[in-house]
């Protein structure tokens, strides 16, 4: 007989995950007492640059829950990061550069909205999550005891906003020797502060408020705020105002920590704000704690993956340095970037996570699939899960770990494998039973023209069935 006792529903749920994992081997008699060291065990996915389909998100959540991860941050808008590549060798004027990049650089906003600019530009990208899909994702996350955190990134990384409102493009001086075209992804906080703030809030209102709001039901909202190269004082004012806006809705604000790189006199209230510590140059973790913030260790080294297909492992590489993360990282440990090792018992250190950034799009497109992205998430997730749970009985090094015999969570199928019993064959005489595009029946068989596809009840079909 197996008896499960827990103080909360989440505790009982995690006990069942343990039993499922033990079921991969032989169950033994005994008593298990299990609890996490940190309350936040997270993953950040960039679906703003590279759209990750709904079914892949479901597989990610199922596997997070299986490994007792409980926070999924979805980076829902962003743009090609190396914007100046678009104008190299073109010898354009400064205004010509801005116009060219605004028109041609790839950007994404992945939430269904009806926001359209006076110029006819839609805020929402062609590839996006519908309102129903987002509500299903939020509902599933709650069932799996995962905190689903949508991120809408402004005032930088905001090309999708500027395309709709080009009049709100930043016109002021740029810091950090940034190229002129960086402005197309920056909102104007100098000359049009009130207009910019009102526009951004109006978008958030559509996302969060009302029966048809696609993100209704979330408890934490990430407002972005990283890598803005305009005025520090106006930036600080904007961060403060957006934090207060989210708090006034009864929600928990989360941001990318950046005040160390943006010093100034303008106060920013960080009490109760969750701060992603991603770069020690942008944000000192001790300074964030001193301001009352709850910090999350998602330091770029060793937790960032920037998929490129090279199979490399390391800082900003195809795979994050998951071995270094396991061996030398914990939510309270920032020494991988020569930062401090803080007391793990500090209540303002709520946990840590890892991230997959899809920077390689547009002129750097790699052709990687959503399953390729899943693999990079999954490889680091095992290190994140163990180091944020924090058991003192875990293997001391990555090499000493015992690999699970069943890699993926029950009910998940990230590889989209098909049982032999479910296989079928499409023949010229049966093609009419499927929704076919640019596929023609000929005397020699089936002829596939450019952009051809076949769709059946199981979705898109591959050539293995033909």
Where are these regions (language model features)?
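Conserved small/polar residues in nucleotide/adenosyl-binding loops
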Residues: 464-466
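Flexible, acidic glycine-rich loops studded with aromatic residues
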Residues: 266-273, 279-442
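Active-site beta-loop-alpha junctions enriched in small/polar residues
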Residues: 48, 77-81, 153-157, 226-228, ...
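Feature activates predominantly on carbohydrate-active enzymes
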Residues: 2-184, 195, 201-218, 357-360
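Extracellular carbohydrate-recognition regions
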Residues: 436-459
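Active-site neighborhood of glycoside hydrolase catalytic domains
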Residues: 178, 183-272, 279-280, 285-286
